[in-house]
Swiss-Prot record:
The gene is baiI. The keyword Lipid metabolism applies. This is Bile acid-inducible operon protein I. It comes from Clostridium scindens (strain JCM 10418 / VPI 12708). GO terms for biological process: bile acid catabolic process; lipid catabolic process. The keyword Lipid metabolism applies. Pathway: Lipid metabolism; bile acid degradation. Keywords: Bile acid catabolism, Lipid degradation, Lipid metabolism, Steroid metabolism.
Length: 16
């Protein structure tokens, strides 16, 4: 959930 902002998805792919 820390990399959610970097991935682009804030609640969909919070582990990406």
């Amino acid at each position: 959930m820390a990399v959610k902002a970097i991935s682009g998805c804030d609640k969909d792919q919070e582990l990406i």
